[in-house]
Amino acid sequence: MSNAPFPIDPELTAIAIAYRNGRMIADEVLPRVPVGKQEFKYWKYDLAQGFTVPETLVGRKSKPNEVEFSATDETSSTEDHGLDAPVPQADIDNAPTNYNPLGHATEQTTNLILLDREARTSKLVFNPNSYAAGNKRTLSGTDQWSDPASNPLPEITDALDSVILRPNIGVLGRRTATILRRHPKIVKAYNGTLGDEGMVPMAFLQELLELEAIYVGEARLNIARPGQNPSLIRAWGPHASFIYRDRLADTRNGTTFGLTGQWGDRVSGSIADPNIGLRGGQRVRVGESVKELVTAPDLGFFFENAVAA
């Protein structure tokens, strides 16, 4: 990267790579997979092949039946996502001891890059079009889990059992998670004869649904135009998704609901800019090249409007 027009700073790049916002779940839901070039190919498998049993009986002198596993070659490309943060030279010169304005700008800019990825991931995962025709349901009225008379447990478990590979993780919006944890029928399952009021631990809900993990989307987005008062909405809406995730899957091997192709590492650097304030300054840039993909729509089930907004 030393020949790049915008100089890459190893120290700032290390900050950008190491930065983690624990309240964002995109990397868990659609894990990052390295790709060799910006344009890459990935395979879409015919899932029926893995479940269609051929004749395996072989006669004493006959030839065994042959099987062939085929896949559809799909082409995609990573997209560059980056932001600049101008840092006035005056801020650098007057920074207190142990405070690095460029490092701080890198962290804040990285957070926005990750927030944008969170929004893209939620739009993909919480989208009915990302799921096979029979693997989605829109709830309304008394069917929504926010209605105490609803019965989410059999609905969810029946949906999980209907997927060709039973989902192993759940993805919930914050309101969906909270309402499920205090739903009287789920609380009753936890309390037994002690009543149906209270709130069950998330670990109990995970165990009850036989999932490896449940991820709750916490991120909020400001949808107000520049100059207007902030208007915050949840990146992960009042929905619920249950998907099969294989962390070992990549663009060529393994079967998983979705993944994120990543070309290279996240990068960061700074360059002098004489047009920042009176004394100029440094322009900090953070970016990454990624593409979020759903590779197996059959391996998930989506409840749209699982709870009232």
Curated annotation (Swiss-Prot):
Residue ranges of the TM segments: none
Keyword Membrane among record annotations: no
Keywords annotated in UniProt: Capsid protein, Virion
Chain intervals for the UniProt region annotation (Disordered): 64-83
InterPro entries: Lambda_capsid_assembly (IPR053738)
Compartments, as annotated in UniProt: Virion
Annotated Gene Ontology cellular component terms: viral capsid
Function, as annotated: Probably the major capsid protein.
Note: Mutations in this protein confer resistance to host-encoded CBASS viral defense (in P.aeruginosa PAO1 transformed with a CBASS type II-A(GA) system). The above mutations are predicted to lie on protein-protein interfaces within or between monomers.
Subunit structure: Multimerizes.
Protein name, per record: Major capsid protein
Organism: Pseudomonas phage JBD67
Species classification: Viruses, Duplodnaviria, Heunggongvirae, Uroviricota, Caudoviricetes
